[in-house]
């Protein structure tokens, strides 16, 4: 019996697009309503199976001249499947962590990042019996975001101990992927500080597959060496770390940071200054392994294939597959980042199409690669790199066909390469600037110029990097050449980042981003047949969407003005208290002993978030005393907008308080160890605010004592920042 062929006559040339959109819509639904849907996963699986059976039945028994029933069943099946895969992935991350401090055996899963006082990494919990009570954990295999202190504040070592008091001093060694750590700490659920407008770090970690977070003090963790349970991906990252360490003998810190990022995808040594330079100059994609890097490597392999005998199809196919295996090995060594996986899959689809006389570079291949990625990692849909990678490639595939290259350039390879690079840069920047503005709030305007230097230099660095890593005895000879190229690129990009007007600061809302993409889509439809045959219907739609976008942004600016209010910002150190009169006039009250520099460090994350969204001018930083018409601060008490706030961050003695001062809010911070009854000898509050800097013991104790005194309690650890409208 002849197997029926999938009827695609009435579909567009990209059937994978519809499947991808349906699957992505299901992923969005599953993420938005996870709590309500997680109990119905089994029924959803049955529904997917039923839809597949119906689709197969349509292929055999329905009129094959009509594709609507098949497309409908396939679309609904992909939609439900996307929901099922996302919900199942989220359920696999759920865990109830043990209460209190326990001993964990953790394997370093990714490349650790060394900060000034801590190591930060993602670790996987390994099977172990608790040293204290012999209980077996049920959280085996879960990922935890760990921060381990390198030393105590006073520089003294403390012992990794169990309940019997035995222990060993923790070793501060260079951490690598695959190292096994014994940690005595408490693992908590993912949470944020709860400040308004802050980056949702907990959600970002969850979408990376992380289930908990932990902080381990110095001396309470110990590096026991290489783990015996390393998977292949961790072994690859460990090998990469050794390669980077060997390169450090011949390259400076800045050169090593950029070189290892471009060639191996190791960005752990790239500091904030380098990131800002590359971002402001519009070439941050050079530091992130993506289709650019795989395209360079595969282009080199294509040069080799051109000299082979194409008539020997089997041998030629074998060489193509060998090249693809090389790309997969490169992606494996880099840790399989989403952008690199997308590029590798797309190149694989392209080579298959090309071998069978199909169109190699098509939108269908792009969405086929995306569908495969989401099928195995549904939360990759929310990854910024994944979105930017797809947007840039989709823009290039769609818009490059509209740009006609003059025939005179076809005879001049160098000039043709320059024009092609400029066009690709313009199209990629046009396709990604809404997402870049939404996530990073900046749009580099001179990215096209920067790419003329960054892309060729990255090409040379990647080629030389292959020789540098494969032939170690040439490293001393190649180091000066690499230093020259890296210095050339870094100097030029640093100059481009400082050019006046080179960066546009733009903070669009999600609605505005969607409308901008509507404008781009309508423009593409209008110019689809060329400049001479403009479809003015779509031009009018684009103008309407652009006008609506401007209106949405103007309304957002009008809504951003702040009314008088007091905000207690969440912080694990001293709590910054923000007295806001208006967006242009405010005061930031810091705890005693923390001056302007300390305030700058603690509230740095607020500048690019809540303050920028509401156009808040730099506040007046208050440490001890302030006397203004609208604000008065004296010691540990402040008056603003008819409200009185007192803060306690030191031990108070009983019997020394006179008449209690009536206050609206009593802020209790780390350092306060006196019972609440003693604090009430000094202050008579309407509400007690507990800082997140308090330990669990003191937070529970103060909360219980406040309830016994019939006082309102606000726990910043559980509820985040406290915002009081005046």
Language-model-detected regions and their locations in the chain:
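N-terminal leader/targeting segments
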Residues: 1-101, 342, 534, 688
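Functional transmembrane helices that form membrane-embedded active or gating regions
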Residues: 2-17, 100, 410-430, 449-452, ...
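Membrane-interface helix/helix-cap signal primarily in integral membrane proteins
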Residues: 2-9, 65-69, 77-285, 614-633, ...
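Hydrophobic alpha-helical transmembrane segments in multi-pass membrane proteins
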Residues: 3, 18, 26, 65, ...
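Membrane-embedded alpha-helical segments of integral membrane proteins
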Residues: 10-61, 383, 390, 476-528
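Divalent metal-coordination and catalytic microenvironments
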Residues: 26, 106, 185, 262, ...
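Non-globular, low-confidence helical/coil segments that flank catalytic cores
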Residues: 172-173, 183-186, 204, 413, ...
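Membrane-interface amphipathic/re-entrant loop segments adjacent to transmembrane helices
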Residues: 221-234, 280, 437-453, 461-517
């Amino acid at each position: 019996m002849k197997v029926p062929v999938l009827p695609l006559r009435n579909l567009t040339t990209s059937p994978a697009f519809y499947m991808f959109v349906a699957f992505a819509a299901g992923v969005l639904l599953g993420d938005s309503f996870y709590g309500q849907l997680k109990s119905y996963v089994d029924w959803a699986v049955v529904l997917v199976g039923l839809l597949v059976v119906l689709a197969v039945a349509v292929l055999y028994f329905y009129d094959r001249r009509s594709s609507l029933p098949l497309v409908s069943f396939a679309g609904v099946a992909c939609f439900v499947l996307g929901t099922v895969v996302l919900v199942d992935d989220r359920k696999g991350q759920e865990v109830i962590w043990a209460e209190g401090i326990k001993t964990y055996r953790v394997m370093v899963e990714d490349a650790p990042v060394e900060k000034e006082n801590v190591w930060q990494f993602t670790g996987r919990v390994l099977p172990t019996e608790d040293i204290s009570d012999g209980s077996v954990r049920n959280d085996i295999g879960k990922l935890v975001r760990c921060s381990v202190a390198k030393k105590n504040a006073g520089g003294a070592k403390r012992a990794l101990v169990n309940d019997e008091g035995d222990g060993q001093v923790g070793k501060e060694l260079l951490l690598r992927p695959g190292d096994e750590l014994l940690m005595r700490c408490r693992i908590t659920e993912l949470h944020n500080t709860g400040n308004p407008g802050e980056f949702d770090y907990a959600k970002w970690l969850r979408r990376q597959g992380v289930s908990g977070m932990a902080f381990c003090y110095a001396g309470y963790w110990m590096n026991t060496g290489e783990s015996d349970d390393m998977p292949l991906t961790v072994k690859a990252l460990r090998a990469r770390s050794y390669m980077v360490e060997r390169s450090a003998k011949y390259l400076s810190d800045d050169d090593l940071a950029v070189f290892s990022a471009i060639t191996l995808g190791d960005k752990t040594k790239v500091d904030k200054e380098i990131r800002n330079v590359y971002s402001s100059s519009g070439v941050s994609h050079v530091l992130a392994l993506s289709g650019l890097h795989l395209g360079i490597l595969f282009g080199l392999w294509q040069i080799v294939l051109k000299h082979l005998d194409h008539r020997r199809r089997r041998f030629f196919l074998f060489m193509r597959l060998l090249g693809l295996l090389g790309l997969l090995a490169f992606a494996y060594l880099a840790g399989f980042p989403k952008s690199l996986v997308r590029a590798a899959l797309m190149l694989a689809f392209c080579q298959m199409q090309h071998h069978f006389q199909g169109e190699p570079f098509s939108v269908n291949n792009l969405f086929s690669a995306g569908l495969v990625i989401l099928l195995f990692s549904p939360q990759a849909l929310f990854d910024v790199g994944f979105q930017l990678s797809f947007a840039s490639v989709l823009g290039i595939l769609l818009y490059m066909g509209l740009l006609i290259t003059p025939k005179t350039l076809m005879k001049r390879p160098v000039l043709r390469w320059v024009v092609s690079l400029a066009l690709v840069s313009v199209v990629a920047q046009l396709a990604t600037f809404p997402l870049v503005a939404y996530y990073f709030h900046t749009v580099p305007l001179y990215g096209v110029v920067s790419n003329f230097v960054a892309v060729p230099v990255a090409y040379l660095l990647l080629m030389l990097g292959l020789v540098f890593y494969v032939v170690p005895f040439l490293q001393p000879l190649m180091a000066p050449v690499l230093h020259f190229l890296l210095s050339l690129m870094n100097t030029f990009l640093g100059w481009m980042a400082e050019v006046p007007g080179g960066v546009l600061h733009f903070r669009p809302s999600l609605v505005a981003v969607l409308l901008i993409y509507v404008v781009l889509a309508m423009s593409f439809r209008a110019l689809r047949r060329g400049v001479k045959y403009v479809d003015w219907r779509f031009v009018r739609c684009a103008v309407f969407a652009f006008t609506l976008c401007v209106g949405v942004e103007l309304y957002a600016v009008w809504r951003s003005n702040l009314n008088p209010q007091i905000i207690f910002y969440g912080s694990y150190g001293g709590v910054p208290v923000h007295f806001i009169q208006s967006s242009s006039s405010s005061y930031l009250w810091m705890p005693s002993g923390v001056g302007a520099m300390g305030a700058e460090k603690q509230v740095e994350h607020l500048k690019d978030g809540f303050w920028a969204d509401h156009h808040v001018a730099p506040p007046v930083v208050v440490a001890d005393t302030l006397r203004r018409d609208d604000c008065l601060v004296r010691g540990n008490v402040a008056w603003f907008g008819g409200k009185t706030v007192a803060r306690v961050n030191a031990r108070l003695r009983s019997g020394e308080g006179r008449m209690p001062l009536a206050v609206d809010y009593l802020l209790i911070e780390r350092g306060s160890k006196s019972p609440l009854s003693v604090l009430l000898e000094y202050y008579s509050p309407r509400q007690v605010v507990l800082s997140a800097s308090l330990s669990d013991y003191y937070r529970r104790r103060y909360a219980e004592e406040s309830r016994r005194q019939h006082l309102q309690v606000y726990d910043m650890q559980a509820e985040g920042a406290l915002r009081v409208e005046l």
